[in-house]
């Protein structure tokens, strides 16, 4: 079984974010991590490797620095890493990104493709389903548990989150899953895994290596959506706790609202 896992290097947004004048994220000002949903998807692939002897190839699109998440993935147990990087691919929205990744994946053999549900730097949840559409594959989104993989009959059974419930979905292989962070707890890298990861060669592809993709669907020029404006959310100050009897508390709160001209 050949499993492809799409991962993305994203800024760690827990400490807040900074923006460039053009509205894009200032990634140089933040630590870079593997997107959490993608990491859960990687762990799912590695568990299938442990169980079925699958070969796991991790693919990322980004700047040369994105090689770091491929090394991390291989240190966790992935077999191969592919970096798709080219200046002409920069500024891509979800449409152009999915076209790029699909063009890269056409070079590889696969029985299953796993992506994260969404990236924390965009939160669109669009790229995974778009890749499946470009490749003509069935997609199961919001995967929270893989119940069964049948290699002989080529199908997979997955629990798909649906509000506070879940669907049990069966799909023929090859197919694409988008994984929730709750799918599982990713394993840690091991010293031996780190050593092996840095001993391996990363495959690097550019525009010329993408199959069946028109230039009009790539990069900033091929992106039908662009950022009009972006800003950090206003962070609220600490709240105030009122510990008076009910009548006095009500009077106090009304007074505070009046001070701020809310009432």
Regions found by a protein language model. Name each.
Residues 1-263:
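N-terminal glycine-rich FAD/FM-binding segment characteristic of electron-transfer flavoproteins
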